[in-house]
């Protein structure tokens, strides 16, 4: 669809945004059982998103897995919030049109969003001229920023200065396009909102990473189709 001549004219090849969104798995917490087949109090380890306490039993992705969908992993968005079995859907948006030009679905991990972003942007970065990638502060990590620069991608990433030093310095924030990238990148939330509400992907009805990945890509394409009539109508006559 994006390769069609009229659609291709809507796209720039220089400015993009990336983000991720949680997709709840089609599996209940009752299916999240010890991998060794035993019950009991497992200590669990990892960050705040890796473990949760269920009626005195400690469960984590290291010690437990869903018997309904082994690809789904336990995730808690923040302290005091309910832990759920989830995947992470990732989208790459072209900034001028707001169309989604690539997607990924991955298991939950602390590095999943940044790895998916690198995977998606690499195909667009294979050119002499630098391109830009806008992202929220969750992507502000030194290794990710350095990898983008190696690919000749300008990291228009929001600065995260809470309890640490940001990897984004003045040479980036002073760039004329940085503020524009930070403003436009938020439009990807419109796509995620449509995918999760209108297309029903807030909680998938499929099991297995490959199937959920396919469904996410399909609904992103549907979002683009909904957007296209307006975009094509705004296109200046040839």
Which residue stretches match the model-derived regions?
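Aspartic protease catalytic domain
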Residues: 218, 222-225, 231
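Generic detector of well-ordered alpha-helical segments enriched in charged/polar residues
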Residues: 2, 33, 51-55, 169, ...
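A short, flexible helix-boundary coil/loop motif
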Residues: 198, 202, 229-238
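Helix-centered, glycine/charged polyanion-binding patches within enzymatic domains
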Residues: 39-41, 46, 137-210, 214-217
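Short loop/turn segments at secondary-structure transitions that flank enzyme active sites
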Residues: 24, 29-31, 97, 154, ...
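Polybasic low-complexity intrinsically disordered regions
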Residues: 1-147, 223
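Residue-level micro-sites within transmembrane alpha helices that shape
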Residues: 93, 188-189, 195, 223-226
């Amino acid at each position: 669809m994006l390769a069609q001549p009229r659609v291709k004219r809507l796209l720039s090849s220089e400015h993009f945004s990336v983000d991720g969104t949680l997709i709840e798995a089609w599996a209940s917490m009752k299916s999240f059982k010890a991998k060794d087949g035993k019950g009991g109090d497992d200590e669990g380890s990892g960050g705040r998103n890796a473990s949760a306490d269920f009626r005195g039993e400690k469960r984590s992705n290291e010690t437990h897995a869903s018997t309904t969908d082994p690809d789904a992993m336990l995730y808690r968005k923040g302290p005091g919030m309910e832990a759920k079995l989830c995947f992470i859907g990732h989208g790459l948006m072209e900034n001028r049109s707001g169309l989604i030009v690539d997607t990924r679905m991955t298991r939950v991990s602390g590095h999943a969003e940044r790895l998916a972003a690198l995977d998606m942007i690499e195909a667009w970065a294979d050119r002499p001229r630098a391109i830009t990638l806008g992202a929220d502060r969750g992507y502000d990590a030194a290794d990710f920023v350095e990898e983008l620069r190696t690919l000749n991608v300008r990291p228009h990433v929001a600065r995260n200065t809470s309890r640490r030093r940001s990897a984004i310095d003045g040479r980036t924030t002073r760039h004329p396009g940085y503020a524009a990238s930070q403003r436009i990148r938020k439009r990807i939330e419109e796509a995620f909102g449509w995918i999760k509400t209108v297309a029903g992907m807030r909680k998938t009805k499929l099991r297995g990473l490959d199937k959920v990945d396919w469904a996410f890509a399909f609904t992103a394409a549907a979002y683009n189709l909904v957007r296209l009539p307006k975009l094509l109508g705004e296109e200046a006559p040839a």
